[in-house]
């Protein structure tokens, strides 16, 4: 690869797509992973109506569109729409010619083999990429924290995973997936705010609730005690001004919402919380590496951005682990984008340049080359 051509780094999440150039310290473009199509033909007369809209434009025109998320629970389920998102990423957001830049894509842990092949095929055949690579999201987050061994709790909008990684390689047998993430927390907050007498139901109102969640929610260190405090005083109450000027007050909902990460029963789910899932993941690993995982537990993704989450994880894992074990939870301030940042670091390493799958290799071997070169 020529050094003067910057590689592109594209992290496709269930909720947001993060894209930019290798070597940068933050993504240039962050937009919703949505594709919208007009509900009725010819509604927007003379507006040069497009047959589809992507990202923020789809979001702002949602009143006349049917919105679809092509990535569900971290896995691409609609390739036509996914192709539209990539097209939008290259041509509209980054304004680059994809045939001129190597591209690093990210994938969910345990992504099906056929999916990795399909991603590879689209990059080479549709976008004519000179070279590409597919990396596991959690592994990139670990790199971004300056480690090669540890366990990553990666929680985004559509899915959460606990991924133990040893010397740069994810251990597939010990990866656990939890279908509980940001979108579920937003839904739950909508529900409990309705119980307080506020009504949030439409997609537009859902965006407001997501904003309330991001600005006001936090994780309690001791849930029962926090509930008692909230009941006996108004010290935990905060007010929030809605776009129409109405002011609402939110109390114990602030910590009841993210508490579902630790008690999924709040959402009517029978699964274990994020702390127990992390512990179970560690216990599926060889006894000799557990110590390294406990001491390097890295939080990643937007749903780990709640204040108080690291202290609570520390407390919960300490309670589950052997009493002499040293436990360290690492919560980097930039963890919302650490997958992308890890990709930016990886793709700009001189030692990585031989790892790219080149167009030539693809032409010789076909899509299955991805399993030999990316692991």
UniProtKB/Swiss-Prot annotation:
Its EC number is 3.6.4.-. Keywords: Acetylation, ATP-binding, Cytoplasm, Cytoskeleton, Hydrolase, Nucleotide-binding. The modification N-acetylglutamate is found at residue 2. Its main location: cytoplasm. It catalyses: ATP + H2O = ADP + phosphate + H(+). Signal peptide: none annotated. It is found in: Cytoplasm, Cytoskeleton. One of its GO terms (molecular function) is ATP binding. It comes from the Eukaryota. The modification N-acetylmethionine is found at residue 1. The keyword Membrane does not apply. SUPFAM superfamilies: Actin-like ATPase domain (SSF53067). Actins are highly conserved proteins that are involved in various types of cell motility and are ubiquitously expressed in all eukaryotic cells. This is Actin, cytoplasmic.
